[in-house]
Design a protein with these regions (language model features):
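Bacterial N-terminal signal peptides
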Residues: 7-15
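Anion-binding catalytic surfaces of enzymes that hydrolyze or transfer phosphate/sulfate esters
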Residues: 250-252, 256-266
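Non-catalytic accessory regions flanking glycosidase/transglycosidase catalytic cores in CAZymes
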Residues: 4, 19-254, 287-323, 327-513
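Active-site His/acidic residue clusters
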Residues: 261-281, 327
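Gly/Pro-rich active-site loop or hairpin
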Residues: 284
Length: 513
């Protein structure tokens, strides 16, 4: 296997050639204790570019086939993913959004300028009713991100009442006037977003005091139990987490964390589709870097909360590349290659390992923005490689995490990051069925993987593989099926040992039978 990087055993940075090592592993099928919360497969929809308008929503009068204004093709694709939770309306947009502008007759709703994302004029035709009805159609939990940056305590408190009160209250009456008699069930409430940045440029001490105040007035109505989420840190800001844990403590049910696989926040972030192997391996290292970040935030939380009553939610994550040439600046429209699929699989593998504290993750974003599941253009829709990873991995939702030991080659890439050539995760569902997902990160070489299955009684395994001719391959409107799962048969089980021949740059999910 040829690498232009030093392995972890060597300090030199010259090119050299080595042979791919055999990969060995053991699944501890009887040691699973933690559930992989299905909310780790959460999604995120912001009023940004064409995520909402043209992506999820076209309006009931559109010629694009729709149900009550929601695109039929996108709806069905998302139902097939079993989306567990959807975060809305932002993102940075959330702290400029005033919910009362998005209720009542659509033709009477006031317009606003979306200052964070390209200055687009927002007509508010997609508001509270449209979002919560969408969640009902998808069968997912809504996650409301409240406006703390430019809003008021009263505004957010009234929004909670509007959505969740079934009583004879002013906001419940207003909701009924707008066509919804029965209150919705809204579990997740984010008290602000990125309050250290676009959500108000606050200090953690100041935000902590605001959270305490807001949380008092965001009440539980008629059996609805709010799960209140504090606006947490950006990647390496461990002090933010420490201050919040010290000052808020278990007044919050959870603290958020944002981590993007991005080269930096100034200058070019790199092309989504034009990159070399060195760029690819660096991206894998940056994606895997989220594990160290989670560990360090967890360690801070463990000191203040050893019983793990406060959860950690990675409610924004994914790749962030330069916008596609010819698209509107500030709309964050990017293509999605096999490289992005690996960022998804490696990240989900990490999330599974920390389910004792990590209870939700929301990839950014669901349609047409950043590392999206789906791209749309007028009447057309295309599913991305990332979509297929989420579809292949959905078998892990709410299953029991099974520890898996794996020994494989590792390489060092720039910025002192280390990348194992194989990543793996395993789970057992409520029926006792074991699923294993394997990612061969190696761009050039197949991997021969031998896994000890322990006491499992499996006789065979069936599964799917996601790969492509090139790492830069992607699905376009002209060629929508370049990167798509196919049946996988290169696996054999004999006397408790599974042997898998995993092609280069491939992702596989197996079911043991």
């Amino acid at each position: 296997m040829k690498k232009l990087f030093a392995t972890t055993l060597l300090s030199t940075a010259v090119a050299f050639s080595v042979q791919a090592q055999d990969v060995t592993g053991t699944i501890h099928a009887n040691q699973g204790t933690q559930k992989i919360n299905k909310e780790i497969y959460g999604q995120f929809a912001e009023h940004l570019g064409s995520c909402i308008y043209g992506g999820l929503w076209v309006g009931p009068d559109s010629k694009i086939p729709n149900t009550q204004g929601y695109r039929n093709d996108v709806l069905q694709a998302l139902k097939d993913l079993k989306v567990p939770v959807l975060r809305w309306p932002g993102g940075c947009f959330a702290d400029e959004y005033h919910w009362m502008d998005g209720i009542g007759p659509r033709e009477k709703r006031p317009k606003m300028q979306n200052n964070n994302w390209g200055g687009t004029i927002e007509d508010n035709s997609f508001g509270t009713h449209e979002f919560l009805n969408l969640c009902e159609m998808l069968g997912c939990e809504p996650y409301i991100s409240g406006n703390v940056g430019s809003g008021t305590v009263e505004e957010l408190a009234k929004w909670v009442e509007y959505m969740t009160s079934d009583g004879d209250t002013p906001m419940a009456k207003l909701r009924r006037q707008n066509g919804r008699d029965k209150a919705w069930k809204v579990k997740y409430l984010g008290v602000g977003n990125e309050s250290w940045g676009c959500g108000g440029n606050m200090r953690p001490e100041y935000y902590s005091d605001l959270f305490r105040r807001y949380s008092v007035y965001c009440r539980n109505y008629d059996g609805n139990q709010l799960y209140k989420i504090a606006s947490g840190a950006s990647d390496y800001d461990y002090n933010w987490t420490k201050v919040l844990m010290d000052r808020i403590g278990n007044r919050a049910n959870a603290i958020s964390l944002h981590y993007y696989t991005v080269t930096g926040w100034t200058g070019s972030k790199g092309s989504a589709t034009k990159f070399n192997n060195e760029d690819y391996y660096w991206t894998m290292g940056k994606a895997l870097g989220i594990e160290d970040v989670i560990k360090k935030h967890e360690a801070i939380m463990d000191k203040a909360d050893p019983k793990k009553q406060v959860a950690l939610l990675v409610d924004e994550w994914g790749t962030w590349w330069d916008e596609e040439p010819g698209t509107i600046k500030g709309h964050l429209y990017q293509q999605n290659t096999l490289r992005d699929a690996f960022v998804a699989s490696l990240s989900l593998d990490v999330f599974h390992k920390y389910t004792d504290r990590l209870k939700m993750a929301n990839i950014a974003q669901i349609v047409n923005v950043l590392q999206s599941m789906i791209l749309t253009k007028d009447k057309e829709m295309v599913l991305t490689p990332t979509y297929y990873v989420f579809k292949m991995y959905k078998v892990h939702q709410d299953a029991t995490y099974l520890p898996i030991d794996l020994t494989c080659e590792k390489i060092s890439v720039r910025d002192n990051r280390t990348v194992p050539m194989v990543s793996a995760t395993a789970s057992k569902n409520k029926d006792g069925v074991i699923h294993i997902s394997l990612s061969n990160v190696d761009a050039d070489e197949a991997q021969e993987i031998t896994i000890n299955l322990g006491d499992t009684k499996a006789k065979k395994a069936v599964g799917e593989i996601l790969t492509a001719s090139k790492l830069t391959d992607y699905n376009s409107f002209e060629k929508p099926n370049i990167v798509k799962p196919a049946p996988f048969k290169e696996v054999k089980i004999n006397k408790g040992t599974m042997k898998v021949k995993l092609p280069a740059k491939s992702i596989v999910t197996l079911e043991l039978q």
